[in-house]
Amino acid sequence: LRDYDDADQLGQEDHPEEFVEKLTEIFMEVHRVLKDDGTFWLNIGDTYFGAKGGHFDGANSITNDGTGTKYRESRKAPSKHPYLKTKDLSGVPWMLALSLQKKGWYLRQDIIWHKPNPMPEAVNDRCAKSYEHIFLLTKKPQYYFNAEVIAEETRRRTDVWSINTASCKEAHFAVFPTKIPEMCINAGTKE
């Protein structure tokens, strides 16, 4: 995960469970203030244990240049984990979804955001990642959901959304598409 040189940032925890615990605490506040018939749409990708990630020095991303390489080499190795090994896919999305479910959220759906134009990855020992999870969570078993407003042209929308990342004139490879929050907001609100 990217490091922004802020002691209070999320994502630099030693273990994924610590990250999930912090996010769970934050999202329980969302649960507290959400209307009883409201929906909470959570987009989260996964990470590999021991990955040293990128760095942001306050002005520039130095993920892939020579400085970024030096930075990654200087970062401390993660502390030993009870079962995750270096290069293991951590499983953060499902850890978080199940943690929220245990705390009282209704886990209604796991939507796959398929990215037809995924960010390039410099890996040779696995396939490149091209999807993220979007979890639909609610406070109550009955909630507002307008399936018609997000329907596809000829059918009800499925749980795999093929949506390109957005384009950007600047050097940013993973711009979040506005279509995803638009669909979530439209499906979950009456206005």
Give the positions of each predicted feature.
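Core catalytic lobe of class I
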Residues: 1-191
